[in-house]
Amino acid sequence: MARLTALLFLPVLIESAFSISFFLPVNTRKCLREEIHKDVLVTGEYEISEQVVTVHTSSTVVGDGSIFKITDSSSHTLYSKEDATKGKFAFTTEDYDMFEVCFESKCTGRVPDQLVNLDMKHGVEAKNYEEIAKVEKLKPLEVELRRLEDLSESIVNDFAYMKKREEEMRDTNESTNTRVLYFSIFSMFCLIGLATWQVFYLRRFFKAKKLIE
C-alpha cells in the first residue's frame, strides 16, 4: 500500500489550546503544523486506539504499532515515542519556529483505522496554576490575577511580534522598491545609449552608401 501523507496547517492565534480527533488509516502518516513563539511552554496529551492484529495462515498482517513524533523546522526531534498508545509530552521552545506533530501507523493489512485524540496547549494555557498556587501559597483571587497577568503579557508579546514582522516586511518592500527604481533607471540609460548608437550607426551607413551628405 502506498504511503500517504496529510498535513493540517494551524494558523497562529491568540488562543493557545486546541483539541482534535481523527482517524489514522494503516500505513499512513498524518501531521499537524503550528507556529509557536520563542520561550513558550508547550504541553499536551495524546491517545491512540490500539490495533487488534489477528494473524491468519492465509493472510499477511504486520503490526508494528504507531509512532508519535514532534519536530521543528530543522527536523530536530523534541519528542518521540514508538508503539505509542497514550502519553503526555512537554517542552519549551528555544526559537520562534514551525513545529510539526506527526502520527504514523506502521501496521499493514486489513485492520481498522486507529482513532487519534490530541490535546495540545502552549503559553498561558499550558501552565498549571493549581500547582503554582500550592507552591506559592496563593489565594484564588491572586491565582486569577497571575493568570490574567500572564495572558496580558502573552497578548503584548504577540502584538510586538506582529509589529516587528510588519517593520521587516516594510523594510523588505522599501528595499525592493529601491532596487526596482535603480533597475528602471539603468534600463532607461541602456535604451537611450542603444538608440544613440543606432542613430550614429545608421548615419555612417547612409553616408557610406552616399544616401545622405
Swiss-Prot record:
Keywords: Cytoplasmic vesicle, Endoplasmic reticulum, ER-Golgi transport, Glycoprotein, Golgi apparatus, Membrane, Protein transport, Signal, Transmembrane, Transmembrane helix, Transport. It is a single-pass type I membrane protein. Residues 201-213 are cytoplasmic. GO terms for cellular component: endoplasmic reticulum membrane; endoplasmic reticulum-Golgi intermediate compartment membrane; Golgi apparatus; transport vesicle membrane. PROSITE patterns: GOLD (PS50866). Its main location: Golgi. Residues 1-19 form the signal peptide. The keyword Cytoplasm does not apply. Belongs to the EMP24/GP25L family. This is Transmembrane emp24 domain-containing protein 10. It comes from Takifugu rubripes (Japanese pufferfish).
